[in-house]
Regions:
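Long, aromatic- and glycine/proline-rich binding clefts that accommodate carbohydrate-like moieties
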Residues: 38, 136-137, 304-311, 358-413
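Helix-loop-helix "hinge/cap" segment bordering the ligand-binding cleft or interdomain interface
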Residues: 59, 120, 138-213, 222-263, ...
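Extracytoplasmic "Venus flytrap"/periplasmic binding protein-like
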Residues: 56-130, 164-175, 271-272, 279-280, ...
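Extracytoplasmic/periplasmic substrate-binding proteins
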Residues: 44, 57, 103-105, 207, ...
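Hinge/lid segment of periplasmic solute-binding proteins
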Residues: 33, 100-155, 196, 211-216, ...
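Extracytoplasmic ligand-binding clamshell segments of periplasmic binding protein
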Residues: 77-81, 89, 194-197, 203-205, ...
Length: 449
């Protein structure tokens, strides 16, 4: 998950608004009756200055409620183990940020509060898009185990100038799988811009931690799924899933792919788009936050001036999907200040607070109302809003992490084979064999639940 920083002055302009919001519902003393409560909150690397930004956002809450918040930074490289240890041992903060796909695993540890009796105070399920609300769940364990905090989705970025030179109409290019492929093939006619080589498309490969996020939308668009409906078996080798994966991997040998991108992770491919090496890629909303930032020197001028965003193409089912993720907030059972902890979550769930914090990070708010407000800012933001409305996440099972890793490895193998780097020639049977292997590995993991 990436977050982008907006200048300090922009952050400070939000604080006066936040103060008014916090004051409208605040009480001078905590619900427990204590004169002073200090909550400990774990956050991850939500931008270059995550703690400072968070403290500025929380200042009105602290001032108006008398509740102090000790914001502690826990890096993404260690947060999984630290949250796990805290949930098991009971030596934990009050509130923690958690990645959306991690919530089921953490909830299964029995170290977190069921927030089902509290979430109506912030609008409950109806305040969120379906795919986002799904991230609060754990299959087989009724309850609400987290509250969505901020959201990211993946959708298509493209170069308006390159599409125009190639005679490709963006209004029709992204309508269907067929039109998307045809557009990419037509873009091959533009070999360079201002003397710099450019390729129609680029996406990360096996080194990308989020590779599954990039490919699963095509599986879903073909009518496939990651698991069967009862979550007991893998569905990644179904005919529909095979069709979705193969549509994506077929782009590699079609002459539209910058093959060097397959050796890179997502941030590196983002740099390729900003640097003018590719005309199309699938990325998150944080890139939009950098378009007008002069200090982001990765952008070449012609790319910066011509950024377009479009929805994912409609698949054979007549629908399009995108992956939605982000971060949620969870309350530890061991907290001595659960009421105050949820007051903090209520504050962070207010529409204006959500919108302002999301802008700092270059993400989207988690709630529908501020999402719609962000979507109305411009055409590019609207494309992300539409993506979120059609967003989907993975099955809410505790063992999803290992299953995702198994899929990631096999997806990476397929892309390598498609690029001519595998031990076998690229064909439908090669794709099927890798996906069947992924299914076997996933089924072994699922049988251990």
């Amino acid at each position: 998950m990436r977050a982008k920083r907006i200048r300090f002055a922009a952050v400070m302009s939000f604080v006066l608004v936040l103060a008014a919001i916090a004051g409208s519902t605040a009480q001078a003393r905590t619900e427990s009756g204590a004169a002073q409560v200090t909550l400990t909150m774990w956050i991850m690397n939500n931008g270059p200055e995550p703690v400072a930004d968070m403290k500025r956002i929380l200042a009105p809450f602290e001032r108006s409620t008398g509740i102090n918040v000790n914001v502690q930074l826990v890096g993404w490289d260690v947060q999984y183990q630290r949250i796990t240890n805290a949930a098991i041992s009971g030596e934990a903060p009050d509130v923690t940020q958690a990645g959306t796909t991690q919530v089921p695993y953490f909830a299964a540890l029995n170290g977190f509060e069921n927030l089902a009796s509290r979430v109506n105070r912030i609008g409950g399920r109806k305040a969120y898009a379906g795919g986002i609300w799904a991230t609060t769940q754990l299959a087989g364990k009724p309850g609400v185990w987290s509250v969505p905090w901020f959201t990211e989705a993946r959708t298509i970025y493209y170069r308006k100038d390159v599409y125009k030179r190639a005679g490709v109409n963006p209004q029709t290019a992204f309508k269907t799988w067929a039109s998307f492929r045809a557009a990419l093939l037509k873009l091959r006619s533009v070999r360079n811009v201002n003397g710099k080589p450019i390729m129609p498309f680029g996406q990360p490969g096996k080194t990308a931690w989020d590779l599954v996020h990039h490919i699963m939308p095509f599986v879903w668009g073909a009518g496939g799924a990651e698991l069967t409906k009862n979550h007991r078996s893998s569905a990644i080798a179904s005919p529909q899933a095979i069709r979705g994966v193969k549509y994506f991997s077929d782009l590699v040998p079609a002459g539209v792919f910058l093959k060097s991108s397959l050796e890179k992770n997502a941030p590196q491919v983002e740099e390729q788009f900003k640097g003018g090496q590719i005309a199309t890629w699938i990325g998150g909303p944080w890139v939009l936050a950098t378009v007008n930032r002069a200090d982001d020197e990765a952008w070449v001028p012609e790319a910066r001036r011509n950024v377009g965003v479009a929805q994912m193409p409609v698949g054979p089912t007549g629908k399009f999907y995108t992956f939605v993720g982000g971060s949620n907030l969870m309350v530890f059972k061991s907290s001595s200040h659960k009421n105050e902890a949820f007051r903090l979550i209520q504050y962070l769930s207010q529409n204006t607070v959500q919108r302002n914090y999301a802008r700092i990070m270059g993400m989207f708010p988690a709630r529908l109302v501020p999402q719609r407000q962000e979507g109305n800012r411009n055409a590019n933001s609207k494309a992300f809003y539409q993506a979120i409305k059609h967003g989907r996440t993975y099955a809410p099972i505790a063992s999803w992490g290992p299953v995702e890793n198994a899929y990631k490895t096999r997806f990476g193998n397929i892309l390598d084979i498609a690029a001519g780097q595998g031990r076998v020639s690229y064909s439908r049977s090669a794709v099927v064999n890798e996906l069947r292997a992924a299914a076997r590995e996933a089924n072994t993991l699922l049988s251990q639940r």
